[in-house]
Amino acid sequence: MAKKTVAAKKRNVKVDANGQLHVHSSFNNIIVSLANSEGQIISWSSAGKMGFRGSKKNTPYAAQMAAQDCAKVAFDLGLRKVKAYVKGPGNGRESAIRTVHGAGIEVTEIIDVTPLPHNGCRPPKRRRV
């Protein structure tokens, strides 16, 4: 006889007017997350979630679509001001921040938190096409 599984309860996240915008932009994808002031995620989106595949995922347009989807949900829940934390070397960093600002959420600060190695791992070799 199969065991009955209980569906996990959805957490209730407290949304106040101030929050955080996290933009993670890699060479292959872009992930946009909006969190409350304590760091609990309110909404998130990515270029892959928006239906982009392959090399189209790391474009400014894909970042714009992901940020628009994420910002609309958070704005409806009551988020109005954010600090933007940007991480990674990808293309759509500025595009995502502009889109969130255009959706009615005020961006008060932009902070670059890209991790920089102090000569750690060897980088991948150059492509020869």
Swiss-Prot record:
Keyword match RNA-binding: yes
Family label: Belongs to the universal ribosomal protein uS11 family.
GO biological process, one term: translation
Biological source species: Phocaeicola vulgatus (strain ATCC 8482 / DSM 1447 / JCM 5826 / CCUG 4940 / NBRC 14291 / NCTC 11154) (Bacteroides vulgatus)
Xref: Gene3D superfamilies: Ribosomal protein S11
GO annotation, cellular component aspect: ribonucleoprotein complex; ribosome
GO molecular function terms noted in the UniProt entry: rRNA binding; structural constituent of ribosome
Keywords: Ribonucleoprotein, Ribosomal protein, RNA-binding, rRNA-binding
Self-association and partners: Part of the 30S ribosomal subunit. Interacts with proteins S7 and S18. Binds to IF-3.
Pfam families, alphabetized: Ribosomal_S11
Known role: Located on the platform of the 30S subunit, it bridges several disparate RNA helices of the 16S rRNA. Forms part of the Shine-Dalgarno cleft in the 70S ribosome.
Record-given protein name: Small ribosomal subunit protein uS11
